[in-house]
Regions:
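Juxtacatalytic substrate-recognition/specificity segment
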Residues: 229-336
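Lumenal/extracellular ectodomains and adaptor appendage modules
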Residues: 26-235, 564, 605
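Beta/coil-rich, acidic/histidine-enriched accessory regions frequently appended to metallopeptidases
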Residues: 259, 385-386, 421-623, 642-647, ...
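Acidic/His/Gly-enriched intrinsically disordered linker/tail segments
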Residues: 314-315, 335-441, 488-489
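C-terminal region of N-terminal signal peptides and the immediate post-cleavage residues
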Residues: 22-36, 631-638, 658-664
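Bacterial N-terminal signal peptides
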Residues: 13-24
Length: 676
């Protein structure tokens, strides 16, 4: 349906002979079995926006269906024709005679005209008549069905002609520059005439008395800007309200509601202005019922890509507020229709209460309940729309009541910031990271459930099962319950360590099988961590931070498990080395250890382990082991060497002593005289 609802046209018998006259004598006249006269009309609706009227021209061909007899001749001189009740300035002309037209009666939104042909129409004869009248814009409420102005044309074009007689046609002529939409009909076109007029036309009509085409046309380039501003929280939003030049009432109405309503909506939602600094508001013929982010049928339509709000010229405060709420709840923030419509309606109602505006909210009816569906199955259009709008609002109210306004606003703040559920940040947990993980896209039914449960600490599983999910979705909720329980247990077991992002991403995308496998593997690593902690303490070692970094990082749980195995192996090596240290060394071993510093290697090994240098840990430990292992051999060799040395010293000393104690030999020197 285009524009305001049109009244249903009631078929009226529109051609009948008022008088059949017989002339002559003899046998009774042979009157046709059907109506004595047929009317075939070519009707042209010439739209004159500047004059606020439509000039209608009806070219009628009246044909007598009577037959003369030998003794009698028959003729007709008048007929009935139905036209819209709004027809004024009725005139009729013919090529001969003096035809006339008067209103015979009015009924069912139509005026029944009495056409006097101005001459006698003999049996089987035809006469062309031209009927003209005006359809004028009556003024009044903006949602009136008939509106003819330079900015907007809205009317219904009737088919005119005799019921049951085919061949009548309908044409609509619009001035250049208009963009038109056609409902019912059908009318084809437009065809551009030489003077620029746009022509829409019907095919020959088989039942003109029931034909009606709804036409709505505007001139997009005719909008006039009107600028202003409004504060939404801490932000200033520039308004550019673009209205038709001849519709100051719409501009004033929309400006008033938006100036007061945007701040109230921001407060109700709890999120600041999300789009660019300027909001363009455009007057249009009608609203659009569409995907997430558009208003309800006949409501405003928001385009997040360009920051434009289209509001129909008929809009009341409810439609204006609801359309403005989609500046938040649009495809940039949410991807599911029920979320956008339900929370937009909730914000509209709460803002209306704050502003003392009587808002019309979707209400659940018995008829709507007859079309109940899971909200995940709600598509655009169709018989379930009434249920969808009412159910979406009711669920939004239930969510707010269960979560509390503070938690709900926090969830929307997360959604607006692109903040994921399952954050690793927790200021009360030692070691928790400082920054939040962001980059999330528009919220769907799964993301919303995660965010709201995360902020409120309450379960919404029951509400989702009752209102949202299709039967095929229920298994996902079952898997989610189990995976979240395992996640909570793993988070608690891992503290103060933070689980790796990969497992949170799996939960965020509802890949519960993947998340479960990874969580189980992480639990195994946590068990390894505890074993490492106990073994390290027993060995006098301080566990390094390497395992935590790998555990929390992006290398994967396999890398963490490998690191844990390696650390445990190094601890085992170190423990074995400690076990090899002589506890009650013999004299030989004690002598072998003289001059060594195996404890320096042990200290160095402990320091290397704490620093995460596992190779150095093993190297220093093995060095200490080597000292202890060789101590007995070294001691033995040292004893032998010492004994040998001692024996040599003893011998040397004996020799020295013996030499000193031996008697001195007397030396006799003889002098010899030399003979000369």
């Amino acid at each position: 349906m285009i524009g305001p609802n049109r009244g249903r046209r009631v078929p009226i018998v529109i051609a009948a002979v008022l008088a059949v006259v017989a002339v002559g004598f003899g046998a009774r006249g042979a009157v046709a079995a059907g109506p004595p006269v047929t009317l075939v009309a070519a009707t042209t609706y010439d739209v004159l926006p500047d004059e606020h009227r439509i000039a209608v021209t009806v070219k009628v061909t009246a044909t007598s269906t009577l037959k003369d007899t030998i003794t009698r001749r028959f003729y007709v001189d008048r007929a009935y024709l139905a036209v819209p009740a709004s027809a004024t300035n009725l005139r009729i002309s013919a090529t001969s005679g003096k035809p006339s037209v008067t209103v015979s009666s009015r009924a069912a939104g139509a005026a029944v005209l009495l056409l006097r042909c101005g001459s006698q129409l003999g049996a089987g004869k035809s006469i062309p008549l031209t009927l003209t009248f005006d359809i004028a814009d009556p003024g009044g409420a903006p949602d009136r069905a008939l509106r003819i102005s330079p900015s907007l044309v809205m009317f219904s074009a009737w088919g005119i002609g005799a019921t049951g007689v085919s061949g009548s046609t309908v044409r609509v002529r619009l001035p250049a520059g208009y963009s038109a939409s056609i409902g019912r009909g059908p009318l084809t076109g437009p065809v551009t005439e030489s003077d620029g007029h746009l022509v829409y036309a019907s095919a020959p009509l088989s039942t003109p008395g029931t034909f009606v085409a709804d036409l709505a046309a505007d001139r997009p380039g005719l909008l006039v800007d009107g600028r202003g501003s409004v504060s939404v929280g801490a932000q200033t939003v520039m308004l550019n309200i673009r209205a038709w030049p001849d519709d100051p009432d719409w501009r004033a109405r929309v400006s008033d509601v938006l100036t007061r309503g945007l701040p109230a909506l921001g407060s109700a939602i709890g999120v600041g202005w999300l789009i660019g600094p300027t909001l363009e508001v455009r007057e249009t013929i009608s609203g659009t019922a569409g995907e997430a982010g558009t208003g309800s049928a006949g409501g405003g339509s928001f385009d997040a890509a360009v920051g434009r709000l289209d509001i129909p010229y008929t809009a009341d405060p409810t439609i204006i507020l609801h359309g403005a709420a989609h500046a938040w709840f649009n495809a940039a923030l949410v991807s599911d229709r029920w979320i956008a419509e339900g929370f937009a309606a909730l914000a509209t109602a709460e803002a209306g209460t704050a502003l003392s505006i009587a808002v019309r909210s979707p209400a659940m009816t018995v008829e709507a309940l007859g079309h109940s569906i899971p909200l995940n199955a709600w598509a655009v259009g169709g018989p379930d729309d009434d249920f969808g709008y009412a159910a979406a609002l009711q669920l939004a109210r239930n969510i707010e009541a269960r979560a509390g306004i503070t938690a709900l606003r926090a969830a929307w703040a997360d959604a607006a910031a692109g903040t994921f559920a399952y954050q690793p940040t927790d200021p009360l947990v030692e070691g928790s990271v400082d920054t939040q993980e962001q980059g999330a896209g528009p919220v769907d039914w799964r993301t919303l459930l995660d965010l709201i449960e995360g902020q409120s600490g309450r379960s919404f599983d029951g509400l989702w099962r009752a209102w949202v999910v299709r039967p095929s979705d229920a298994a996902l909720l079952d898997a989610r319950v189990d995976a979240r329980a395992l996640y909570a247990a793993t988070v608690e077991a891992a503290a103060p360590w933070v689980l790796p992002r990969s497992v949170r991403d799996a939960l965020r995308t509802w890949q519960f099988d993947t998340a479960t496998v990874e969580l189980q593997d992480l639990m195994s690593v946590i068990d390894q961590r505890e074993s490492i902690t106990r073994a390290a303490a027993a060995a006098g070692l301080s566990p390094p931070t390497a395992l935590r970094h790998v555990f929390e990082g992006t290398a994967g749980v396999g890398a963490a498990a490998a690191e844990a195995v390696t650390e445990q192996a190094v601890i085992d090596v170190f423990s074995d080395v400690l076990a090899a240290e002589p506890t009650d060394p013999s004299l030989v071993i004690t002598i072998g250890l003289l001059g060594t510093d195996s404890q320096a290697d042990i200290v160095a090994a402990r320091e290397a382990f704490a620093a995460g240098d596992l190779d150095a840990t093993v190297s220093h430990a093995q060095a200490a082991r080597a000292v202890w292992a060789s101590a007995e051999d070294v001691g033995g060799r040292r004893i032998i060497s010492g004994a040998t040395l001692a024996f040599a010293v003893v011998v040397l000393l004996w020799l020295l002593v013996h030499r000193r104690r031996a008697p001195k030999r007397k030396i006799v020197r003889h002098a010899h005289r030399l003979e000369e």
